[in-house]
């Protein structure tokens, strides 16, 4: 029977998912693992959209006083009755997600942080009338509710103290996306001020806090301990390199197969794996949950839908562009190897500060790994990490960013672009060949590997389109229907009514002349100029272009 449960697209509240009949992949084993591997302060680092917030929401629902036992019925953790009796619903919980702390100025971001803290205070509004609190405590709490600046650094510690007075229990502190304020501060130029604020906030809450039971933090980066966790000796970091908890963030093969089968979509497993699997956390191979849930949700309505770039489209992916912008010859070569499925070997830094990210290429490789753009494929004998692109979605992202970089850098040299485009009108094949070849040598290409010929042609096709697009008054059509087939590129130059046909071929065996001849023959057989004639063009120029690796050949039809 096909599952009728709704899919939780974009929902990261455990309680909402369980109460409202959404499909839930059981990750409550995380609770048991946490309690069996005790740590007073635990930081989980995982890429974005890997279920961090949902898991933290689950921990809140489990530990918080007044916990609803029914939320966990039928789940893994409910089988461990002894553990549930000892810990479920036993602690006051302070739950903060810092993903919304941003602003163009430090004052704006600080104000936003104050609002988030005040909202969490408001969730414990009962403290305002608690008999266990003194009048001084209540006055302080009322002041904290306003979110005023001077209370920020001590606010979490003070709230845990007030909760202890009321409940007689130490607090569980959960801070989700702890590093977002630092990331935004780095982007907007107030990094040092934000580091000072967060260091003070965390130092009070996590280091010198007698009212802390245990704390859980999540983030994408393991920010240097010396940066914001100074002196925190009770600190345990569980990164994507750690085998502990390796299946608790992300979906496993079996979980994805079960999900697809539940909705009658088992036949779509191969493409789901090709596009969204490939991440190696510890000893586990996992899929990106955001991708899988979105894809299954779309398949549920239309089984012909193709996989999409859900994860990569949920962010600007600036880190990939920064790598490409800074790439020297060696780095370009390494990016090319990654795109065709090879591994590169790197020494990675596990602890960075945001202001170190751009200091060298090595730091950028480390961040790409930590944030999910690259994954681990083992180690070398000397301890280097073998890095690879995890799946088809991320490969597409790299290619997209390379094209954007090529377009932007090419546009900076308008004189050269003008010369290149005019060479097509002047029938100057030598100039076209020379300049196109130079562009190919300066970009990052797809190598001659098992990649399908059509994919290689698409790469060169995209570069050529980007270059010709410099001419704002030229009408350029890609893969336009013409005659009895589709031509690669049609160009209409209105001011002299000239139509240009370009057929591009990839010379898989390296024979550029033969590939050009094939292109010209195809143009004659398919009557590609018909569409240009219909559009009023009177003069016609036909080019066959062949590419192999970073070489090209250009011929013109007689």
Across the structure, where does each feature detected by a protein language model lie?
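Structural signature of nuclease core domains in nucleic-acid processing machines
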Residues: 429-558
């Amino acid at each position: 029977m096909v599952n009728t449960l709704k899919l939780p697209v974009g929902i990261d509240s455990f309680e909402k998912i369980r109460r409202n009949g959404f499909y839930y992949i059981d990750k409550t084993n995380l609770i048991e693992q946490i309690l069996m591997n005790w740590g007073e302060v635990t930081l989980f680092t995982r890429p974005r959209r890997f279920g961090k917030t949902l898991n933290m929401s689950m921990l809140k629902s489990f530990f918080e006083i007044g916990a609803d036992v029914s939320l966990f019925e039928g789940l893994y953790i409910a089988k461990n009755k002894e553990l549930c009796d000892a810990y479920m619903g036993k602690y006051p919980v302070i739950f903060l997600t810092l993903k919304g702390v941003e602003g163009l100025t430090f004052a704006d971001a600080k104000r936003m942080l104050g609002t988030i803290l005040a909202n969490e205070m408001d969730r414990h509004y009962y403290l305002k009338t608690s008999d266990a609190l003194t009048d001084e405590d209540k006055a302080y709490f009322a002041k904290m509710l306003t979110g005023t600046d001077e209370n920020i650094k001590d606010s979490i510690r003070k709230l845990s103290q007030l909760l202890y007075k009321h409940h007689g229990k130490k607090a569980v502190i959960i801070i989700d996306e702890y590093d977002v304020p630092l990331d935004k501060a780095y982007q907007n130029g107030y990094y040092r001020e934000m580091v000072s604020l967060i260091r003070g906030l965390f130092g009070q809450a996590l280091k010198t806090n007698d009212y802390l039971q245990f704390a859980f933090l999540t983030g994408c980066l393991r920010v240097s301990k010396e940066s914001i966790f100074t002196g925190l000796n009770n600190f345990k970091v569980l990164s994507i390199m750690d085998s502990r908890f390796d299946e608790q963030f992300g979906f496993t093969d079996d979980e994805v197969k079960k999900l697809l089968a539940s909705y009658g979509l088992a036949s779509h497993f191969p493409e789901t794996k090709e596009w969204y699997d490939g991440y190696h956390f510890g000893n586990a191979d996992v899929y990106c949950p955001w991708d899988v849930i979105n894809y299954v949700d779309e398949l549920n309505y239309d089984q012909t839908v193709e996989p999409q770039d859900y994860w990569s489209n949920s962010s600007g992916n600036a880190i990939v562009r920064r790598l490409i912008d800074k790439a020297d010859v060696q780095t370009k070569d390494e990016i090319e190897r990654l795109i065709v499925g090879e591994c590169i070997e790197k020494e990675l830094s596990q602890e960075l500060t945001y202001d170190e990210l751009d200091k060298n290429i090595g730091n950028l490789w480390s961040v790409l790994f930590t944030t999910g753009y690259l994954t681990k494929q083992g180690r070398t004998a000397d301890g280097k990490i073998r890095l690879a692109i995890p799946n088809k979605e991320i490969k597409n992202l790299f290619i997209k960013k390379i094209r954007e970089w090529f377009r932007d850098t090419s546009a900076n040299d308008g004189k050269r672009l003008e010369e290149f485009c005019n060479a097509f009108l002047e029938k100057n094949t030598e100039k076209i060949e020379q300049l196109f070849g130079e562009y190919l040598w300066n970009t990052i290409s797809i190598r001659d590997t098992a990649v399908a010929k059509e994919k290689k042609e698409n790469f060169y096709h995209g570069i050529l389109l980007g270059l010709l697009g410099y001419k704002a008054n030229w009408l350029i059509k890609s893969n336009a229907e013409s005659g009895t087939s589709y031509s690669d590129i049609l160009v209409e130059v209105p001011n002299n009514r000239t139509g240009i046909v370009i057929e591009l071929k990839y010379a898989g065996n390296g024979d550029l002349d033969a590939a050009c001849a094939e292109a010209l023959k195809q143009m004659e057989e398919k009557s590609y100029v018909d569409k240009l004639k219909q559009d009023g063009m009177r003069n016609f120029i036909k080019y066959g272009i062949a590419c192999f690796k970073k070489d090209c050949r250009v011929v013109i039809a007689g």
